[in-house]
Each structure stands twice: as structure tokens, then as C-alpha cells.
């Protein structure tokens, strides 16, 4: 069994869509997904480990003592653990996910690593929790799963809850306004999945399961939202194919 060197999480192979289904249901973060999630995301998202490393380095630079750090949509706690390694004394991390199986497994993983930085795990909707006294907020590939109409409101709340000098790290699958670019870059991402061992059946069934669940935005839409929230400095700091991570800094 492989173990992630970033999180210590056991990596079980993702075979959820390896067998044909008569009808593919909507993707859910249930027990079956939790069991294979580290393998799923590493084989599906190019640059994922680089983003985790960057989250740690940005936490080291921008996290403020006696402040709160948020991981909104924490899944198994990979970003939480990365942040905690770099967080200053006196800070605490609030990690939130709507999936109870994710929260339960995240608790096991986080408790497996000693740290003086406390982590508060919440099974809740990120759009409903208060953001207060924050110096770092991370949304790592989870904004795309909430209703588009709720996204601006959430970013507004995050901006208001950030301390001056605080940051938002927002990682998302993006789409392109140009149909030609969309086709070309999507081809590269599909080739990445094929190279990582996913079959055509797995790729097609996974895509069908996500069709009405993951709703992506363009780079321009993300940047416009961030600007509308009040961020004066915001841009992509990392991109691999159609996966991008934005950094927004509150003045």
C-alpha cells in the first residue's frame, strides 16, 4: 500500500468507475469516494502536489500569529496538514466539509500528526459558517461544487473576514472562452488521466457523474468575482492545463 508523503494518508487505487453501470449516478463524496480520494485526485488533477506545497509556502509567508486559518472544503485534510506545518504559534485552523465521511477520515489523519497548532473540524456548509479574524483562507477545488449563485456571496464574506494582509488561495478547474482552446487543453488533461491508468470507460463514466455537480468558471469570471469582493491584488499563481490556483491578497 502506498502512503502519501505529504499527508501520510494511505493511497488505495481508484476503481470506482472501472465497471460499467446501467445508469451513472451523480458524484457524491461518500464512503466509497473517501476510500480512494487521494489516488483519485493525484491521478486526475495535474499539479496537485505542487499546489499543496505552494499552500504551505504561502501560509508560512502570510499567516499571522493569533489569527484563524480556514480550509473550506477540506476533504481528507491534505491542505490542512500542509498549512499546519507552516502556521505560526497562536493560530488555529478551522477545516470545514459537508461530507461526514470526509470529516471522520480527516480527523483520523490529522490526529496522526503531532502539532501545537489546533485544528477544529466542522461538518458544515462553507457558505454558512462565519469567517472571522482570518489571515489565510484556502478553497482547494471545492467552490466549483457549490451553487454558482452562492459563490460571490461566499467570496464577499471571506474578504470581510480576512485581516489586512491576509490571503485567499482559490484552486479550481477552469474552462476557456475559446472553443478551440477548451478542446485542446481538455485533450491534454484527458491524456494525463490516460497516462495515469484510467480507461476510456472510467473517464466517460466519471465525466457523466460530474456533469451537473461540478460547474466550472472561466479565469475571467474568477478574477471578476475576486475584484468585486474587494481584492485589489489577485491572479493565477499556478496553472496546469485546465486546473488553476488563484492568489488574492487583502490590502
Swiss-Prot record:
- GO biological process per UniProt: tRNA wobble uridine modification
Top-level taxon in the UniProt lineage: Bacteria
For this protein, the record's Pfam families field holds: Methyltransf_25
Q: Does the keyword S-adenosyl-L-methionine apply?
A: yes
Give the Enzyme Commission number: 2.1.3.-
Q: Binding residues for S-adenosyl-L-methionine, per the UniProt record?
A: 48, 73-75, 140, 207
Q: Name one GO molecular function term.
A: S-adenosyl-L-methionine binding
Which reaction does this enzyme catalyse, per its entry? prephenate + S-adenosyl-L-methionine = carboxy-S-adenosyl-L-methionine + 3-phenylpyruvate + H2O
Answer whether the UniProt record assigns the keyword Transferase to this protein: yes
Per UniProt, the keywords (alphabetical) are:
S-adenosyl-L-methionine, Transferase
**Enzyme class label:** transferase
Q: What does this protein do?
A: Catalyzes the conversion of S-adenosyl-L-methionine (SAM) to carboxy-S-adenosyl-L-methionine (Cx-SAM).
Oligomeric state and partners? Homodimer.
Give the protein family: Belongs to the class I-like SAM-binding methyltransferase superfamily. Cx-SAM synthase family.
> Could you tell me what this protein is called?
Carboxy-S-adenosyl-L-methionine synthase
From which source organism is this entry? Hydrogenovibrio crunogenus (strain DSM 25203 / XCL-2)
Amino acid at each position: 500500500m502506498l502512503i502519501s508523503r505529504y499527508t501520510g494518508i494511505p493511497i488505495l487505487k481508484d476503481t470506482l468507475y472501472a465497471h460499467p453501470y446501467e445508469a451513472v449516478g451523480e458524484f457524491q463524496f461518500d464512503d466509497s469516494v473517501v476510500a480512494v480520494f487521494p489516488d483519485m485526485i493525484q491521478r486526475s488533477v495535474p499539479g496537485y502536489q505542487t499546489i499543496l506545497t505552494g499552500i504551505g509556502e504561502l501560509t508560512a509567508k502570510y499567516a499571522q500569529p493569533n489569527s484563524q486559518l480556514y480550509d473550506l472544503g477540506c476533504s481528507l485534510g491534505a491542505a490542512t496538514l500542509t498549512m499546519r506545518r507552516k502556521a505560526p504559534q497562536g493560530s488555529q485552523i478551522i477545516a470545514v466539509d459537508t461530507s461526514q465521511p470526509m470529516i471522520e477520515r480527516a480527523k483520523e489523519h490529522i490526529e496522526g500528526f503531532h502539532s501545537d497548532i489546533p485544528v477544529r473540524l466542522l461538518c458544515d456548509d462553507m457558505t454558512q459558517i462565519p469567517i472571522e479574524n482570518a489571515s489565510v483562507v484556502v478553497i482547494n477545488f471545492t467552490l466549483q461544487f457549490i451553487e454558482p449563485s452562492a459563490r460571490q456571496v461566499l467570496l464577499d464574506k471571506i474578504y470581510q473576514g480576512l485581516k489586512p494582509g491576509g490571503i485567499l488561495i482559490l484552486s479550481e478547474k477552469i474552462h476557456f472562452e475559446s472553443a478551440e482552446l477548451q478542446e485542446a487543453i481538455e485533450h491534454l488533461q484527458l491524456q494525463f488521466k490516460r497516462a495515469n491508468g484510467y480507461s476510456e470507460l472510467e473517464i466517460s463514466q466519471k465525466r457523466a457523474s460530474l456533469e451537473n455537480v461540478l460547474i466550472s468558471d472561466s479565469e475571467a469570471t474568477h478574477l471578476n468575482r475576486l475584484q468585486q469582493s474587494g481584492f485589489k491584488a489577485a491572479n493565477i499563481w499556478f496553472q496546469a492545463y485546465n486546473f488553476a490556483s488563484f492568489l488574492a491578497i487583502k490590502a
